[in-house]
Amino acid sequence: MKRILSVACGLLALVGFGLVGGLGAGTCSAAVKLKVGASPTPHAEILKEAAPLLKKKGIELVIVEYADYVQPNVALNNGDLDANYFQHKPYMDDFNKQKGTKLTAMAFIHYEPFGMYAGKTSSLKDLKKGAIVSVPNDTTNEARALLLLKDQGLIKLKKETLDVTRLDIVENPMGLKIEEIEAPQLARSLPDVDFSIINGNYAMLGKLKVKDAVATEANDSLAAATFANVIAVREGDENRPELKALVEILKSDALKKFMIEKFEGGVVPAK
């Protein structure tokens, strides 16, 4: 009898929560588990804020934190996660191409402005020839850093697209030395470089605030329109009701308010 009840509860959990108000009370009290990989900041913090709202819908959110940009995609593709939340679509698309994974963006949740932070040099007006600027070493985020340098008038590029590399620099009047560093290490590189262009989440982990950056991406820039962070899932899972419920809550007014107030400009809700 217990086995029959358990199976029945499982079936009800799959069809009875989410967009129509959650699981019913009574004997079927077991929550559906939803396992989501995330960067510690801000993604895991945002998910923790969403967890109680999901619980009301009969969904237990299990958050798995990752310190890098590779393992959460590997784990999702292998079926160890139901979704992940740490990356933008260009990075995910490039990862799919490079690794042969089959991941897709289910929804755009928020945008993290890239910031250029002072290291050994305190402001752009004090910039000297041969200054060292550290940038992310992955393809899409390095392009984003180069576009920010271009927007500050520090370099000129032969094209202004999201696949630019250092080879596309046609003018570098200050002779900037651009060093590629793994994104998680950028904040730590500040004592050794003049400036570092840092991903929003790693800037926050390094206790850096967007308001203190010497330059940031504009909210109406190409980057802002392109690099919103997504809920990524395996291809074919887009219609799972528990994932739809997660997206609905992350895009709710309550979560948007949390992002704005908690992160002070470091996290901008996606439109």
Enumerate the predicted regions with their spans.
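Periplasmic-binding protein-like
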Residues: A143-K150, L250-A270
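Short helix-initiation/N-cap motifs at beta->coil->alpha
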Residues: I63-V74, T161-R188
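A conserved helix-loop-strand patch within extracytoplasmic ligand-binding domains
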Residues: M106-I155
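Short, low-complexity disordered leader/linker segments with a strong preference
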Residues: M1-K33
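Short, well-ordered beta-strand elements
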Residues: A30-T41, I59-E65, I132-V133
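Ligand-binding "clamshell"
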Residues: D94-M106, T121, D192, I197, ...
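A bilobed periplasmic-binding-protein/Venus flytrap-type ligand-binding module shared by bacterial periplasmic
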Residues: P113-L124, F227-R240
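Beta->alpha turn/N-cap motifs
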Residues: E65-Y69, G79, A83-D93, I109-H110, ...
